[in-house]
Amino acid sequence: MIVALDSFDEPRSGCTTLTASLLALHLASKGFRMLDYPRLVRLNPAVPWKTRGNAAVALEFEGSAEELFEEAKAFLERAPGRGALAVGEEFPEVYPDAVEKVLDPDEVAKKFEGLWWGRKEALVGALAAGAAEGLNNFELLAYRLPQNLGRPRRCSFHPAYEALLELAYPSIHESSPEVVCPKGPDPVLLGIRGSHPPLMWAALQLFDGEPFWLATMFRTNQHSYEPSRRAEEYPYEFVQKEFEGSYEVRGEDVLFGDYVLFNETGITKIFKEMIGYENKVSVKLDVVVKPGSKGVAALRDLRALFWKRKAPKCPKCGGPMVSMGKKTLMRKCKKCGYKAEVLPKLEIKVFEGTVFPVQGRKLHLEGDYRSPPWPPEGRICEKPGCAIWVAHGFDHH
């Protein structure tokens, strides 16, 4: 049975992932058996009404829908935020659309035959988390002690941490000390990303900043989602578009037709360095569509050709040789007057690859880390202890 929830946070407090972690511990204490890691599902990055973390969570437990619903509802009525809870065995296929489009909450609610409670707007995210499959990446979140909330985070690691990241990559990825600790007021202390939970737990043991009281391992779509290609696009959508042609550098940004790669992504220098060259590119653009802007979130399968014609040098004095007309190969040295048939020099450069914004600037969803399923076949996370660690002496009830 799936227990899914969304929007249990507030602008300056609370966190849906923390609420879900505590709910999982609560349900286990009531005798319900946990069946897998909690799921953390990042949602549409284009909508302006998203929550701070822009994610919903789903838990999988063994038990009757009615009993799980009543127990979870009673627990969540005391939680921060005004979110939604959904409990059922089957969820409507709304996951891709909830990540890429704007959905009508009333229409989504009609498709769900299970039990639910809360706001319809939050129900969309909860149902998306409940329906999500194929989540082979993980995020390990650790939470601050309540008495430290509102104070600056103390985020530091043992020197061995960076050595572990280098050795374990890509089983641990995008978790450098500079980006693991968020800057906002939420209770998350740090987040380690990867695809191998045992190595990620080991990395957490090398954290020597402020103490944390709880840590949870989530399955997630983070760093692995590729939006679908569509001919049409509408405001507040996350979509992939194909572009062929020449890009243009305008100010600090780079334009691919109507789509803008903003300087803040940290990757515009790839194209700015080629100013003075003519260019032809073929690329798939992941685009966040908003009113007045279509921002590029990633460049996939980029193929770029750059070329520049250079005037040949005079073989006698080394001066520049200029053309004597369009219908002739004759050139004349501007310095000494020497004439000869000389072909212009053509400098060509080629770039191929997939490019994402730098760490700390990319969307949660963006990345190319698609790993084999974990745990290995025949093993699942059947108790909170394999996914949730609670510091000694803290009563979670």
Curated annotation (Swiss-Prot):
Subcellular location: Cytoplasm
Gene Ontology CC: one annotated term: cytoplasm
EC number: 6.3.4.22
Keyword set, alphabetical order: ATP-binding, Cytoplasm, Ligase, Nucleotide-binding, tRNA processing
Top EC group: ligase
Catalytic activity: cytidine(34) in tRNA(Ile2) + agmatine + ATP + H2O = 2-agmatinylcytidine(34) in tRNA(Ile2) + AMP + 2 phosphate + 2 H(+)
Keyword Cytoplasm: yes
GO biological process, one term: tRNA wobble cytosine modification
Keyword Lipoprotein: no
GO MF annotation, one: ligase activity, forming carbon-nitrogen bonds
UniProt family annotation: Belongs to the TiaS family.
Function: ATP-dependent agmatine transferase that catalyzes the formation of 2-agmatinylcytidine (agm2C) at the wobble position (C34) of tRNA(Ile2), converting the codon specificity from AUG to AUA.
Protein name as it appears in the record: tRNA(Ile2) 2-agmatinylcytidine synthetase TiaS
Species classification: Archaea, Thermoproteota, Thermoprotei, Desulfurococcales, Desulfurococcaceae
Gene from which this protein is expressed: tiaS
